[in-house]
Amino acid sequence: MSSLHRIFREVSSSGETSPPELARLLGLELSTVSAKLRTLVQKGMVEFRDGRKRVGLNPTFGYVVGIDLGGSHIHYALADFRGETLCESDEKIQPEAGPAKLIRQAQKGIRTLVARLPRHGRLRAVAIGVPSPVTPNLGVVTWANNLPGWKDVHLKAELEREFRVPIFLENDANMAAIGEHWRGVARRVENFVFIALGTGIGAGVFVNGKLYVGRTGAAGELYRMNVEWPRWDEDFGDTGHFESYVSGLGIAAEGHKSLDTKSGRRASGLREERDAYFVFEALRQGNPRAREVLERIFTMLGVGVANIVAVLDPDLIVFGGGVSKGAPDLMLATVQKVVRKIQPDPPPLKLSALQDNAQTCGAIFSALGLAQDSVARQLA
């Protein structure tokens, strides 16, 4: 590994440093470091700051796109080589349109962002979070319950053919966990679980500072967890036992059973987490039945969290997703009460600091890592 490669790697990981600090960390002569930094500056990869006392990545050396593909929308973000977001856009999708049409829509959205780059700006990587397990290393969407027809879709390969840059694909909850670890409440936390509560439920797991995806990429797929052992052999279909209760869909369904909504909507037709908001609104208006519904569901969530704690013993549990914002105080209090009852030494429970931006933030970080790895290999 060349000294040029090592210096670039250290500048990338530190964000900003100084020549003397680089020399100390890498065990190199200061004169060697200074000469190599001048080479990296000439290549446009890094830049001196504060009168050459500091050095950091050149933000204009390249750009990345981070994408959050949800069950009802696609959110795009364009960031520079230092990870600063430059612009964002959001589009609605038709989930039933099928993979081919949605992939074309995503490609068009990426091209629209790339068209906004400076004249000599270069796209260097794209990362995308999807509502599905992803086959490790292959970037194959295994199955996406909220996107009909998305089974064994080779999304990574499709995007690589179109843009000729490195592509990273990951489950949406995992991507949110990456974002939270980069710039959220889990920053510098080695072992934590991010629980995403939206239309469905999922989790991203960090062990020893690294994302854990499991044998098939399905680690954290909480929707099939069962917390009612007498019903262990019932078939809950693609929804799964846990998700049929502990999710936006579950809250909406239970709300329609217990509250006089006068909406005429059937629970089976509900698709979005916003359909649970009428339960949260009823709670804010003092409806006791709404409180009963939510306490019952949050108690079930607490049992699930206690099981996670028993298996992983994490340092922190983070809650994110649209549903986590509906009644955060009641949710945290109920879950905490249940977990403390079951576990003698439970970890702290916190709400996501990034909320709706967690997945996009994780995608930007992942794309940056890809871009920087690609550049570093050229210097090895």
Residue ranges of model-derived segments:
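ATP-binding/phosphotransfer module of carbohydrate and carboxylate kinases, centering on a glycine-rich
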Residues: 1-50, 56-122, 162-163, 229-233, ...
